[in-house]
């Protein structure tokens, strides 16, 4: 192994896919190897997420600049980890967390800390001349994830009348990531044609999915079914449906209701949708505070549907352990910037997997062309990935990276058995 220590760290302000500033961090080692990371940012965020550092006292970018976070990288984090072995990921992450000193990384900013954390891993991989997935996952990193493709956007990701945030497809009948991407692209373009024929907008939302003005969530699901069929696939066999309700966005904390409905009624609505449509995954079907509701939702649908916690867990190992202990959900969405370091992200993945929960590596609505999450999905055999639609370069970059990894692996590549919660099985 080539010995290498951190020799330099540079950071600068760049723009994400929504036109807001974020960080680009570059770590250089004593051997001259370089690792880079570009940090994403979310629009729909959980209350217990690690906090970004934004220049709220400045008029630049409407108070969303990250110049102070850039300064924190250069003046605090770099001197702190300078000279550390680039392979000591957990040590470097611990030093940064200790220096920050807050439970949610608000002192220095999760965006600053994550940028250094991920760039360090890239630098280590570059020093060893290995791809990131192989450096992190070793020889067992050969499983490609089934993508969850967000084709219709609603909620906080679009300016339309849809209550739910994401209407996704899962190409469960694919035999490779290359075929899965092909299937998704076929449905995407078929859906675009259908929307155009109906005089509906084909403009896209933050995550590359269409954002038409539809009357109901059911209308969105019907359109997806029609697009799947017209593209030549069988719903529930070749391609299943998935939802991200982002229920916290329409939950009233004071009354404990969802647009006036109690959690039993909300669960009944979701259960009814699963009976009528080939839905095999529901994310954030209830609000993050509604533990009683989550327990019931998991009891009612957890045997046949993937019940995904995003805001519920925010990639936080403590919250994941609590959820496991209380029987909440059966799947964890993994977003590195929710927790703020690679070490904690990996721990969250392993905790979920050891408990028998499925895992989904996920992007954010404010993305860059950084493809780290594609490598993470393969490195830790996550099984699934959420990285948006089949449009917008910051989304497509992740699919392209996955196909590149599949080609690199050759005969060793395995496409994940994505029928863990298959619609067909639930019909038996």
Swiss-Prot record:
Mg(2+) binds at residues 244, 283, 310. It is found in: Cytoplasm; Secreted; Cell surface. (2R)-2-phosphoglycerate binds at residues 165, 335, 364-365, 386. One of its GO terms (molecular function) is phosphopyruvate hydratase activity. The active site is at residues 207, 335. Its cofactor is Mg(2+). Keywords: Cytoplasm, Glycolysis, Lyase, Magnesium, Metal-binding, Secreted. Its main location: cytoplasm. Pathway: Carbohydrate degradation; glycolysis; pyruvate from D-glyceraldehyde 3-phosphate: step 4/5. The keyword RNA-binding does not apply. One of its GO terms (cellular component) is phosphopyruvate hydratase complex. Binds a second Mg(2+) ion via substrate during catalysis. It catalyses: (2R)-2-phosphoglycerate = phosphoenolpyruvate + H2O. Its EC number is 4.2.1.11. One of its GO terms (biological process) is glycolytic process. Signal peptide: none annotated. Belongs to the enolase family. Catalyzes the reversible conversion of 2-phosphoglycerate (2-PG) into phosphoenolpyruvate (PEP). It is essential for the degradation of carbohydrates via glycolysis. This is Enolase. It comes from Chlamydia pneumoniae. The gene is eno.
